[in-house]
A protein has these predicted regions:
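Short, well-ordered beta-strand segments
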Residues: 4-9, 56, 81, 105, ...
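N-terminal winged-helix
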Residues: 3-29, 33-35, 42-45, 109, ...
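Immediate post-signal peptide segment of exported/extracytoplasmic ligand-binding proteins
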Residues: 1-6, 97-101
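Short beta-strand-centered segments that line the small-molecule binding cleft or hinge
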Residues: 20-24, 42-78, 82, 145-146, ...
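C-terminal effector-binding regulatory domain of bacterial HTH transcription factors
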Residues: 28-29, 141, 155-163, 172-216
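Beta-alpha-beta core module
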Residues: 65-71, 75-76, 91, 98, ...
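Secondary-structure junction motif
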Residues: 17-18, 89, 102-124, 188-192, ...
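Hydrophobic hinge/microswitch elements
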Residues: 40, 44-52, 59, 112-167
Length: 216
């Protein structure tokens, strides 16, 4: 492949998983122009349906879309993300109801992880103290690092930060599936096929993702 283009999308919390593959792909195929966007899950699905993207990396849609195909990559449990010095950091597991007395910083409504939480645990979410809502996952993790707020995020999004801890939830139905989505029946460009293969290989070599896939 000497020339061509590739249009990739990812939700904010998973875009970092594309970095290594983007570097390797661009070095190997310098003539391929890559456009990458980080958006909310809802916006990515809209862009796929409008043929504005070749594929998108995101967690499962709370609402099934019969117009999209998916390639499953891995499952990740929703976890409570806290600073290592937070009282909750010493726990192995915790229930959502136990978080009522704590100040939470969460992705804003309309972002994929928040939609999943609201859809699966509507009654509990209404009673939690959500003090901050953000549309930037990087800032969200910076705020957790202050040890003032806690958050609920998929474990796979936890940054490589020795100051943060992920505490598993007691509730069932906490796993979320990360997948590549494309339009049903769409033709994969050669560039897209190669990138997807490289991404799958990169994720298979990612130690944290390996542990999630094998539930170790």
């Amino acid at each position: 492949m000497r020339v061509g283009s590739l249009r990739i999308g990812g939700i904010f919390s998973l875009c970092s998983l594309l970095t290594d593959t983007l570097v390797d792909f661009s070095v190997k195929f310098p003539g391929i122009k890559v456009k990458m966007v980080c958006k909310s899950g809802r916006r990515l699905f809209e862009m796929l349906q409008n043929n504005e993207l070749d594929f998108a990396l995101t967690f499962e849609s709370p609402v099934k879309d019969d117009l999209l195909d998916s390639i499953e990559l891995f499952h990740s449990p929703l976890s409570v993300i806290v600073h290592k010095n937070h009282p909750l950091a010493k726990l192995d597991k915790i229930s959502l109801n136990s978080l009522r007395g704590y100040s939470l910083a969460l992705p804003e409504r309309g972002m994929h992880v928040r939609d999943i939480l609201e859809e699966r645990f509507p009654d509990i979410m209404q009673n939690l103290k959500v003090q901050l809502e953000l549309n930037d996952v990087n800032i969200l993790y910076q705020l957790i690092n202050t040890n003032h707020w806690i958050s609920i995020m998929p474990q796979s999004t936890e940054r490589d930060d020795e100051n943060l801890r992920a505490v598993k939830l007691n509730e069932s139905n906490t796993d979320v599936q990360a997948a590549l989505y494309c339009r049903k029946g769409s033709y994969y460009r050669n560039a897209a096929k190669v990138f997807i293969e490289m991404l799958q290989k990169s994720l298979s070599e990612n130690v944290a993702i390996y542990f999630l896939k094998n539930k170790i």
